[in-house]
């Protein structure tokens, strides 16, 4: 009985350390993925907030009051595409030809996992083309890693912060000099809740 009493706490401590190591490795890999994606940004960068209300899944496209922080990041790779990175709720997505990229059932399972949406840019003014005939469209969607790669973990918090400056007489156009990404990886409880 004494041996079991000593081994059980040691085994639990070992599992806890192993889980923390996995969480740190996952967080490092996710940060590197974000860094690699943003590396090609050569147009605008927009800080926004991911959708958290299932009744308004397109709120990520709403105008924001802050130019320097958010839970989602949209940036352009001129002249090819616009990319949106977040970990929050995503609507069902279709491409411009009406083909499903992501069903609503698939989208609901991906809340808490890093995902990237890619949109075409309009040819006239290089603004993001998020809609066609009133429907949100994307030309590609991917997750950084399959859900199984998270090993029972998920992203509980993702936040982007920028250090920036504004030119004299410039209107609402800050110049980003550095960006910080804060990511928290957590474990869901036994019921699968956050």
Predicted regions and their residues:
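Intrinsically disordered, low-complexity regions enriched in Pro/Ser/Thr/Gly and acidic residues
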Residues: 81-194
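Short, glycine/small-hydrophobic-rich surface segments
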Residues: 24, 38-79
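Aliphatic-rich helix starts adjacent to a transmembrane/signal segment
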Residues: 1-39
